Amino acid sequence: MRRLLNATIAALAVGTIAIFAKPTLADACAGLIGSNGAVNLGRTTTLAGYQNGVEHYVTAFQFQGGGGEFGTLIPLPGVPSNVERGGAWTLQRLQQETAPPVDEFANGLALRSATYDAEVLLETRIDALDITVLKGGGPDVAAWAEQHGFRLSPDAPEVLDFYAGRSPIFLAAVFDGEAAAERGQQVGDGTPVHITIPTTNPWVPLRILGLGKQASDRIDADVFLLTDDEPALLPAPRANMTLEHSEPATSLLLDDLRADEGMAWVPESAWLTKLQIDSAAEDLSFDLAVDTTGNDSPSPVAAGLQLPVTPDSTGIARSLVPLLSVALLALIIALAARRVRLPGVRQA
């Protein structure tokens, strides 16, 4: 059966929280709001589907009014092969399947300077959204943001490094308020985006939702998973991440999802899981690892609970093992030979 992971991260979830604020706007705090109170990003809902080594992110950014430019930064597990307009109602249909309709979509982040440059891998425009896929470490992405007129919230360096250590790929979605108004977009209108990512290591970013927030600020998000069988999760559901729905997806739901634009990859059968995030920002210090192989072994590294082991460090350590072994053996032989030569020492 095809292997599929779908994660509606209301995740990238509420967050992908406050990403970019132009210098004319205030830094992100509890979501992005302009210094004049006119700019706001609503809740973000994202569907991340994993099938045959390809991850599909379908996310939507909700226009909450205001002018200027503002946006969101999303950590990605790999380099996208395509970024295009997403299905018109897939995310709403998932919400409808598990709960009464609620506001979807999320907010943004804000960035500061560094002396590094991120590599731009892809640029495209979808409606009033300017999409840029970046490759670089935390300082690289921060520098790119400042070079493009955005600010960095105080916690951004730590959060960006948290993700860059696992995957140096980020997607910046910048909302042009004036362009949205010219297009006739109303407050609450969403722009769906479908991101296709070849990867062997899918995960759902959650910590990014707290970017720019105060420790006590609340994070409210929905995470949908669509897998072949009941998935293994790390961390397991807990007080601030409750399991709201876990059962086989109905044929009607899967048929509806496949009927939407760009959603033909949805399988004939799957397990539907819904997690609800209701947490203080300071307590959301992890991501969500999902094991879809049936081995019941989600990765602690993918969950952000362990640091990734770098090739350099492992290579150095491994290369030292034989050298140290030879040195130790030589020392033992030398001591033994010295003991034999010492006068007055009787051998057993």
Task: Give the location of each predicted region.
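C-terminal segment of classical bacterial N-terminal signal peptides
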Residues: 14-25
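A cross-kingdom signal targeting lumenal/periplasmic-facing segments of multi-pass membrane
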Residues: 80, 84-127, 135-141
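Covalent nucleotidyltransferase core used to form phosphodiester bonds in nucleic acids
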Residues: 108-117, 121, 135-174
